[in-house]
């Protein structure tokens, strides 16, 4: 059964379609959007090897002319150089303003495809077809697109909304366990910042550390409630002028860890988990929430199979310095998203470097 979640924003609207087992019907879902004939699929070789034929055949069946551009997997390729190569392919196939770029992949592919679509001919159509849990519940929704800069993650980008987010949860069967757990970090985030009932439902599940531990109903619930939480926030604050910043819970320290480890040894979800644990400890030091609540958060992170300790090779002073490049810095002050209870957070710029350092020292993997 398909679930449709409408996203209504001041200047546009689109749907998130959650349709298990229906990747082969993608073309028919695009037909009502009145897109131009040309479609450029952007993916990575591994994902395209799994799902490329299904998607291409579906689009051709609906009368689209289909081209492809493959980018090697990983954050290391999330660069302006990679975007320039997408432009070359778009030019080669003469993509027009009515044409469409489809992101078939995880969060990295989605971010890059959105940025390429936003900037090619000053903006062409863009469709998200996420294949990782992290992309399904977070990265594909809300219109944040971009690439990394050597000094920080996602520093170059644009807000650019897709015409459709098309989610087929059945594609997760090919997702590596580590990537599944990374996606679960974002699901836990929604439980902390917005949806207490989701958090409690995750607590009640027997196991959460691999896809096979979830029945279809629980997986559908996790994806649907997470998508709805993000839509609720984004629909109130599309351009992150206020409320939307809460979606960065765990990301302030998390992004710094990712950047300083070269986007190689620690993936996004793992870094976010480390950041959430740190934020929970900071919230205790500022008397914002209780020891019991941070224990519940940390136990759920552990239940998912995520490591929350910080590598001892990481220079904590460098982490603190790197925070100054965070996108949420305002008037020179680093803004943290801090929990006040399960399901509620605040935005604070009152976190001193001393508090950050003391928390992270205790979080280092001994």
Curated annotation (Swiss-Prot):
SUPFAM superfamilies in alphabetical order: Dehydroquinate synthase-like (SSF56796)
Gene Ontology biological process: amino acid biosynthetic process; aromatic amino acid family biosynthetic process; chorismate biosynthetic process
Cofactor note: Binds 1 divalent metal cation per subunit. Can use either Co(2+) or Zn(2+).
A GO molecular-function annotation: nucleotide binding
Main localisation: cytoplasm
Entry keyword Ribonucleoprotein: no
Presence of the UniProt keyword Nuclease in the record: no
Protein's cellular compartments: Cytoplasm
Coiled coil stretches, renumbered: none
Its EC number(s): 4.2.3.4
Keywords (A to Z) from UniProt: Amino-acid biosynthesis, Aromatic amino acid biosynthesis, Cobalt, Cytoplasm, Lyase, Metal-binding, NAD, Nucleotide-binding, Zinc
Cross-referenced InterPro entries: Dehydroquinate_synthase, DHQ_synth_AroB, DHQ_synth_fam, DHQS/DOIS_N, DHQS_C
Names of required cofactors: Co(2+); Zn(2+); NAD(+)
PANTHER family, per the entry: 3-DEHYDROQUINATE SYNTHASE, 3-DEHYDROQUINATE SYNTHASE, CHLOROPLASTIC
Family: Belongs to the sugar phosphate cyclases superfamily. Dehydroquinate synthase family.
Function: Catalyzes the conversion of 3-deoxy-D-arabino-heptulosonate 7-phosphate (DAHP) to dehydroquinate (DHQ).
Protein known as: 3-dehydroquinate synthase
Organism of this sequence: Rippkaea orientalis (strain PCC 8801 / RF-1)
Phylogenetic placement of the source organism: Bacteria, Bacillati, Cyanobacteriota, Cyanophyceae, Oscillatoriophycideae
């Amino acid at each position: 059964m398909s679930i449709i979640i409408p996203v209504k924003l001041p200047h546009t609207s689109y749907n998130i379609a959650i349709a298990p087992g229906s990747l082969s019907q993608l073309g028919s879902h695009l037909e009502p959007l009145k897109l131009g004939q040309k479609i450029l699929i952007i993916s990575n070789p591994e994902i395209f090897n799994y799902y490329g034929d299904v998607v291409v055949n579906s689009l051709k069946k609906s009368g689209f002319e289909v081209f492809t551009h493959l980018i090697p997997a990983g954050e290391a390729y999330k660069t302006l150089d990679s975007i320039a190569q997408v432009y070359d392919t778009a030019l080669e196939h003469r993509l027009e303003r009515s044409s469409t770029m489809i992101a078939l992949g995880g969060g990295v592919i989605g971010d890059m495809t959105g940025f390429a679509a936003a900037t090619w001919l000053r903006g062409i159509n863009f469709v998200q077809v996420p294949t990782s849990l992290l992309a399904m519940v977070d990265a594909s929704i809300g219109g944040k697109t971009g690439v990394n800069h050597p000094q920080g993650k996602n520093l170059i980008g644009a807000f650019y909304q897709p015409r459709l987010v098309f989610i087929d949860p059945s594609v997760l069967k090919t997702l590596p366990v580590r990537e599944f757990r990374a996606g679960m970090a974002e699901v836990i985030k929604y439980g902390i910042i917005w949806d207490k009932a989701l958090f409690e439902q995750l607590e009640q599940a027997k196991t959460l550390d691999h896809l096979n531990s979830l029945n279809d109903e629980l997986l559908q619930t996790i994806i649907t409630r997470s998508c709805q939480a993000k839509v609720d926030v984004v629909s109130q604050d599309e351009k992150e002028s206020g409320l939307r910043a809460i979606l960065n819970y765990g990301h302030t320290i998390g992004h710094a860890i990712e950047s300083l480890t070269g986007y190689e040894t620690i993936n996004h979800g793992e870094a976010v988990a480390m950041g959430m644990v740190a934020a929970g400890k900071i919230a205790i030091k500022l008397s914002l929430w209780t020891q019991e609540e941070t224990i519940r958060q940390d136990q759920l992170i552990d239940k998912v199979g995520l490591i929350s300790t910080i590598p001892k090779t990481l220079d904590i002073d460098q982490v603190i310095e790197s925070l100054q490049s965070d996108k949420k810095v305002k008037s020179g002050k680093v803004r943290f998203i801090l929990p006040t209870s399960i399901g509620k957070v605040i935005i604070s710029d009152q976190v001193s470097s001393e508090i950050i350092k003391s928390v992270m020292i205790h979080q280092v993997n001994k």
